[in-house]
Swiss-Prot record:
<feature type="region of interest" description="Disordered">
    <location>
        <begin position="262"/>
        <end position="285"/>
    </location>
</feature>
<dbReference type="Pfam" id="PF00168">
    <property type="entry name" value="C2"/>
</dbReference>
<feature type="region of interest" description="Disordered">
    <location>
        <begin position="361"/>
        <end position="392"/>
    </location>
</feature>
<keyword id="KW-1003">Cell membrane</keyword>
<dbReference type="InterPro" id="IPR037245">
    <property type="entry name" value="FIP-RBD_C_sf"/>
</dbReference>
<feature type="domain" description="FIP-RBD">
    <location>
        <begin position="437"/>
        <end position="499"/>
    </location>
</feature>
<feature type="region of interest" description="Disordered">
    <location>
        <begin position="169"/>
        <end position="239"/>
    </location>
</feature>
<feature type="compositionally biased region" description="Basic and acidic residues">
    <location>
        <begin position="361"/>
        <end position="374"/>
    </location>
</feature>
<dbReference type="GO" id="GO:0030659">
    <property type="term" value="C:cytoplasmic vesicle membrane"/>
</dbReference>
<dbReference type="InterPro" id="IPR000008">
    <property type="entry name" value="C2_dom"/>
</dbReference>
<dbReference type="GO" id="GO:0035773">
    <property type="term" value="P:insulin secretion involved in cellular response to glucose stimulus"/>
</dbReference>
<dbReference type="GO" id="GO:0042803">
    <property type="term" value="F:protein homodimerization activity"/>
</dbReference>
<keyword id="KW-0653">Protein transport</keyword>
<feature type="short sequence motif" description="NPF 1">
    <location>
        <begin position="323"/>
        <end position="325"/>
    </location>
</feature>
<dbReference type="GO" id="GO:0031267">
    <property type="term" value="F:small GTPase binding"/>
</dbReference>
<dbReference type="InterPro" id="IPR035892">
    <property type="entry name" value="C2_domain_sf"/>
</dbReference>
<feature type="modified residue" description="Phosphoserine">
    <location>
        <position position="277"/>
    </location>
</feature>
């Protein structure tokens, strides 16, 4: 037989036997009836149906599936005989024999019948007298399991291997393992070292690749796409990244280190810390540059030069870019009316003392360390310290200077102090401050509030494209299912029969 002709042949791998019913059985019971069951056997496998009690025409409709040990082809010398043995169950003693039938599966397959339902006559045992024992109705169907057919080919490939071939494979496997271990270090992410002229540390450069995260999304959501460098530098805050991108000096980076642990340690139970550090980072970028410029170029005439050194974090959001003397007359008068004459006298004295000490601070550099200490302890200071300063205490000296020289102090006291969860303070009316929505980290829209209009449009277009692709994929799956159902209906399986009666499985005998 040619290989092409053999490939076009259909060879079954399984046979499914369904015992439907029996009739005209010999009575063996006491009441003239039988408690009948049938044993189904092919080779060494045996199955048994349930017991149909007290009847001479039992109905079972139970099936059993057998795997053919070899290929069932035409002209095969190997014969496959299916045995059906009908028995009567006895409560006392051995079960009684009612009849048997032997079915040659080769003959059924050679007749090119994949399915056959037929009544078979029950016969006696060999050597016994032949008599009428009734009939049994059986359905025989040949099936092919592609998984079983492919397993034969795999087993044949494994048998052809010799011990020398296995030894050779082991040597190749060691060599492959060695090359894999040598190249496994390639998955470690590399970190680019900065140049000698660079003003930023390696930690800041690694943080540049970290994506922006909204400050209201919850505590530290790290995705699996982060590299090892991002995970190792996760303790660094976003304030240092923003300071590095603007181009500030090393001094500003050291000052902002005190705020680094605030957003990382913030949890859902205390969202105020996280919001505070985020807003102060947005504030400190332009203002710190102005303060450093004043220290370097020696602007002595401005009475508000050293105000930023004594500011706590809650007052740091006040605008200091504009000169307060250039404000409108109404705002200035309303703020100055709240100051008493002794305070004005002390303000002039402190201004003269500050001008005298400014040169000493520039030479010795003590102001820098003093400012860094204030920034480190600024988050824990409360606004109550500003309201009750002690003029005779050196630790409260800068606080008193700020209260006596800042014209916005009276205006800040007049307004309602907002909760620490929202520090976007600006010279606006109280109605605008009340309109600010409370930030809720559990809000689904909180992550989109920080996005611009263009970014929202990009997200919308991206989601529309994803929906379009999903609709196309769903349509393809529906077409595939329709075609598959048509092919199944053409085969007319038993599940599509009208009326459908689900078949029961016959019990299998144990080998013991």
């Amino acid at each position: 037989m040619m290989l092409s002709e053999q490939a076009q042949k259909w060879f079954p791998t399984h046979v499914q036997v369904t015992v439907l019913q029996a009739k005209d059985l010999k009575p063996k019971g006491k009441s003239g009836t039988n408690d009948t069951y049938t044993i189904i056997q092919l080779g060494k496998e045996k199955y048994s149906t349930s017991v149909a009690e007290k009847t001479l025409e039992p109905v079972w409709k139970e099936e059993a599936s057998f795997e053919l040990p070899g290929l069932l082809i035409q002209g095969s010398p190997e014969k496959y005989i299916l045995f059906l043995i009908v028995m009567h169950r006895s409560l006392v003693g051995l079960d009684k024999f009612l009849g048997q039938v032997a079915i040659n599966l080769n003959d059924i397959f050679e007749d090119k019948q994949r399915r056959k339902t037929e009544w078979f006559r029950l016969e006696s045992k060999q050597g016994k007298r032949i008599k009428n024992r009734g009939e049994i109705k059986v359905n025989i169907q040949f099936m092919r399991n592609n998984m079983t057919a492919s397993m034969f080919d795999l087993s044949m490939k494994d048998k052809t291997r010799s011990p020398f071939a296995k030894l050779k494979d082991k040597m190749k496997g060691r060599k492959n393992d060695g090359t894999f271990s040598d190249t496994s270090s390639a998955i470690i992410p590399s970190t680019h070292m900065p140049d000698a002229n660079s003003e930023f540390s390696s930690g800041e450069i690694q943080m540049k690749s970290k994506p922006k995260k909204p400050f209201l999304l919850g505590p530290q959501r790290l995705s699996s796409a982060h590299s090892m460098s991002d995970l190792s530098g996760s303790h660094m805050s976003s304030e240092k990244l923003k300071a590095g991108t603007i181009g500030q000096t090393h001094l500003l980076g050291h000052q902002l280190d005190s705020f680094g642990t605030v957003p990382e340690s913030g949890s859902l139970k205390s969202p105020h810390r996280r919001t505070l550090s985020f807003d102060t980072s947005k504030m400190n970028q332009p203002d710190s540059i102005v303060d450093e410029g004043e220290l370097c170029f020696g602007r002595q005439n401005d009475p508000f030069t050293n105000v930023t050194a004594s500011l706590p974090q809650k007052f740091a959001t006040l605008p200091r870019k504009k000169n307060p003397f250039e404000e409108s007359s109404e705002t200035w008068d309303s703020s100055m009316n709240l100051f008493s004459k002794p305070i004005e006298i002390r303000k002039e004295n402190k201004r003269e003392k500050r001008e005298k000490v400014s040169l000493f601070e520039r030479v010795t550099g003590k102001k820098d360390s003093r400012r860094s200490d204030k920034l480190n302890n600024g988050g824990s200071d409360s606004p109550c310290d500003l309201k009750s300063p002690n003029a005779f205490s050196e630790n409260r000296q800068d606080y008193f200077d700020y209260e006596s020289t800042n014209p916005f102090t009276a205006k800040f006291r007049a307004s309602n102090i907002m909760p620490s969860s929202s520090f976007h303070m600006s010279p606006t009316s109280n109605e605008d401050l009340r309109k600010i929505p409370d930030s809720n980290p559990f809000d689904a829209t909180a992550g989109y509030r920080s996005l611009t209009y263009e970014e929202v449009l990009q997200e919308l277009v991206k989601h529309k494209e994803l929906l379009r692709r999903k609709d196309t994929h769903i349509r393809e799956l529906e077409d595939y299912i329709d075609n598959l159902l048509v092919r199944v209906m053409e085969e007319t399986p038993s599940i599509l029969r009208v009326p459908y009666e689900p078949s029961r499985k016959a019990g299998k005998f144990s080998n013991s």
